[in-house]
């Protein structure tokens, strides 16, 4: 950029009484420019081009503010900003849902955004804790921490998810390689509805976008301790600091988490699902020159679960004898994940560019094996500890993205990019049938069937999206993405009698398949006023196709291809801010049609998922989100979601016969989700920002089903949480309790009847110091 075209932005930040505010963070959207105000409340930003910029201000104890400023190509008078106490005003919410920084209020997409403060207030430790906070979202697991997530009736039930999860820009490629634990979070964004244009494969239900805190010129850190019942211990810490000011930055955070099991194993009288794990997140950021940034990020998670599948056979057993089971095989799950990325960002005069290369690796195995019959019988166990070369998933991805430049005054803004991935999945698993196998109808005993698979998947994509200002109030959004994927799978089957050599039952066989998909988007946004936006969208998403695995059941042939699943969505939305940013109200209505629906079936006893394309699904509903600060210190939040997700056609095979399940409801999809929170904060000592805080939360989840025939169901129920304590600038002390009434409910169930209950009532104390 020509030096003569560079200009300077200056400004002053004050509070409601016109008192200058010190140490306010000032950030220019979609740039690496961040600075702080001095003791006089003044800030200065140099070396930028003339144009329109969004300036974001944030400071402890104050509601974040964002405002568009028009920077002229000459000396500019200082811009004045006023920040109000967080106790009386809602914050401006920044999101990167569309691959660039924007205000939530201005984006014509259904999004729930949670700030770092809200993540702490809700006490969110795991992605599944977002259930009902996000309208029409449900997430749960069978005790193995691999969450099944449903948004608007689009449900993840296989290792290729239908709801994509991104952490710091990296697609958590499958349930094998994603990290569900939450720590040191900057914000969480949940996009509802198909997001295929910008996010591609497996975003047909939506996207969970998680951003962790990165280091800046301001040194900061925290230490937090949580202790509670069930011997819950959670220790977390983080630090962010400049190594060389304006040049090199370092950040690190980590969590150690352990607890006793919620379940007791009556077979040995011991706690069953004891867990402990370590999660780490490390940043090294380098600014080699003006407008350039290089960021290295490494994440890891190492979990140990002493009883990975705390499940019982049937609903009656689950509720009549809650949190007790009887399993003779107590499998210990080792789950080790490493995710690393290298990002390069440049802000240019013609366009901004971002490149991100990422590597993901997960090795998960059971030692000793896990119980496959969920009973005290020595009948079925699942064995997969065959060394590090097996069940060790590896993924390489690269995204190259271009954006229209920041600050450029134009009626058109755009985003375009390419995406590449390669995935290697070497799997080996044995199903062992013990001396009691005959009691389950197995004609032989003391033998194993061994399935070996090697999968290689490679894909490329190109995408573009344009926002065009048609009039001063009307904006057109249009986008298109093309994805191509090649899948290869080798299968090999063996039979082995205990103490004898194995012999081949299925020779080494290979197959491949190619899949492609177009994902368009078309939308309109109309600005009703400065505080209200109306929008309408059409979007398409898809879940990739694949090849079936190997099972011992001859009716389930291996290497059978199944095609991609597609969702087409139409939605209308209205976003409003009222009463000087004290009241916000967002409303959405949607209609989604899914064709070529993938229906996964868990084949027993091998615990292998076989997928077929069968049927179509229609999902329709509405959503509402409300935030209100009626008086100083009091905040109310409410979310509501209604989903009617019904199969319009669904024919499956059961016991050798075709069964028509037309009219059945989608699984893992509550018909209603509702959440209400009320929090009161009393400012005790203003100079030290000491507040007394009391918070209550109410969750309601409607009826949901866990099998396609709708025979396994959970009736509607309520859950209540609370958080009470003291907050200050440098120290927080809180008592928290979740599921106060100890409500028993089904969190997860397999279609063959195995049931896992949701967490019982838990409580604890949290102490956090910030510096």
Regions found by a protein language model. Give the residues of each.
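Transmembrane beta-barrel wall of Gram-negative outer-membrane proteins
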Residues: 220-222, 227-259, 263, 267-306, ...
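Short, acidic, small-residue-rich periplasmic hinge/interaction motif at the N-terminus
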Residues: 14-19, 24-29, 58-62, 72-120
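N-terminal periplasmic accessory domains that precede
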Residues: 78-81, 127-130, 148-152, 166, ...
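Short acidic/polar hinge/loop motifs at secondary-structure boundaries
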Residues: 168-194, 280
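Membrane-embedded beta-barrel scaffold of Gram-negative outer-membrane proteins
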Residues: 343-348, 352-370, 527, 533-543, ...
């Amino acid at each position: 950029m020509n030096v003569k075209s560079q200009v300077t932005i200056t400004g002053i930040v004050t509070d409601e009484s016109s008192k200058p505010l010190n140490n306010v963070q000032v950030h220019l959207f979609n740039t690496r420019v961040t600075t702080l105000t001095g003791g006089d409340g003044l800030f200065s930003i140099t070396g930028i081009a003339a144009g329109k910029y969004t300036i974001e201000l944030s400071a402890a104890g104050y509601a974040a503010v964002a405002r568009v400023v028009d920077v002229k190509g000459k000396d500019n008078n200082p811009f004045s900003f006023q920040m109000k106490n967080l106790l009386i005003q809602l914050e401006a919410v920044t999101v990167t849902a569309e691959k660039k920084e924007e205000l939530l209020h201005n984006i014509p997409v259904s999004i729930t955004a949670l700030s770092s403060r809200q993540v702490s207030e809700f006490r969110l430790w795991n992605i599944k804790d977002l259930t009902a906070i996000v309208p029409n979202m449900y997430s749960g697991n069978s005790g193995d921490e691999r969450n099944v997530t449903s948004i608007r009736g689009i449900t993840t039930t296989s290792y290729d998810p239908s709801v994509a999860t991104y952490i710091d820009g990296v697609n958590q490629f499958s349930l094998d390689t994603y990290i569900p634990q939450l720590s040191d979070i900057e914000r969480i964004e949940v996009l509802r509805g198909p997001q295929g244009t910008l996010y591609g494969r497996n975003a047909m239900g939506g996207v969970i976008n998680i951003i962790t805190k990165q280091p800046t010129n301001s040194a900061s850190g925290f230490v937090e301790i949580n202790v509670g019942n069930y011997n819950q211990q959670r220790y977390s810490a983080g630090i962010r600091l400049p190594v060389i000011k304006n040049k090199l930055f370092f950040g690190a955070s980590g969590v150690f988490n352990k607890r006793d099991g919620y379940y007791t194993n009556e077979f040995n009288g011991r706690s069953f699902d004891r867990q402990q794990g370590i999660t780490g997140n490390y940043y090294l950021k380098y600014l080699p020159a003006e407008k350039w940034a290089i960021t290295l990020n490494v994440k890891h998670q190492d979990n140990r679960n002493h009883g990975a599948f705390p499940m019982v056979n049937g609903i009656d057993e689950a509720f009549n004898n809650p949190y007790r089971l009887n399993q003779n095989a107590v499998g210990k799950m080792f789950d080790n994940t490493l995710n690393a990325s290298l990002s390069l960002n440049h802000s240019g005069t013609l366009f901004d560019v971002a490149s991100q290369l990422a590597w993901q690796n997960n090795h998960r195995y059971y030692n000793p094996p896990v119980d496959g019959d969920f009973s005290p019988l020595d009948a079925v166990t699942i064995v997969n500890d065959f060394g590090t070369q097996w069940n060790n998933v590896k993924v390489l991805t690269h995204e190259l993205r271009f954006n229209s430049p920041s600050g450029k005054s134009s009626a058109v803004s755009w985003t375009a990019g390419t995406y590449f991935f390669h995935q290697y999945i070497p799997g080996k698993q044995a199903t062992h049938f013990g001396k009691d196998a005959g009691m389950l109808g197995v004609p032989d005993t003391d033998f194993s069937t061994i399935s070996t698979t090697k999968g290689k998947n490679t894909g490329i994509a190109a995408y573009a999206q344009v926002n065009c200002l048609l009039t001063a109030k009307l904006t057109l959004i249009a986008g298109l993405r093309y994805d191509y994927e090649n899948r290869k799978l080798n299968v090999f089957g063996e039979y082995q009698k205990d103490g004898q050599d194995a012999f081949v039952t299925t020779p080494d066989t290979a197959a491949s398949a190619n899949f492609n998909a177009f994902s368009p988007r078309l939308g309109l946004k109309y600005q009703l006023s400065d505080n209200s936006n109306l929008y309408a969208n059409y979007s398409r998403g898809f879940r990739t196709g694949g090849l079936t695995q190997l099972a011992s059941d001859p009716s389930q042939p291996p290497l059978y291809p199944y095609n991609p699943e597609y969702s087409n969505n139409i939605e209308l939305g209205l976003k409003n801010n009222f009463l000087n940013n004290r009241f916000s109200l967002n409303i959405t209505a949607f209609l989604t049609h899914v064709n070529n629906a993938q229906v996964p079936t868990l084949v027993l006893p091998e615990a292998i998922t076989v997928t077929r394309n069968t049927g179509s699904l229609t999902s329709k509903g509405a959503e509402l989100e409300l935030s209100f600060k009626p008086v100083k210190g009091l905040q109310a939040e409410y979310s509501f979601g209604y989903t009617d997700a019904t199969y319009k056609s669904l024919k499956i095979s059961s016991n050798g016969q075709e069964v028509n399940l037309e009219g059945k409801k989608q699984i893992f999809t509550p018909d209603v989700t509702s959440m209400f929170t009320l929090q009161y904060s009393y400012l005790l000592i203003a100079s030290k920002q000491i507040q007394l805080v009391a918070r209550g939360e109410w969750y309601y989840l409607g009826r949901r089903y866990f099998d396609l025939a709708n025979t396994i169901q959970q009736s509607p129920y309520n859950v209540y949480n609370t958080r009470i304590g003291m907050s200050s600038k440098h120290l927080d002390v809180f008592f928290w309790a979740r599921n106060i009434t100890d409500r028993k409910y089904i969190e997860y169930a397999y279609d063959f009847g195995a049931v896992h209950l949701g967490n019982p009532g838990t409580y604890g104390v949290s102490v956090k110091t910030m510096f």
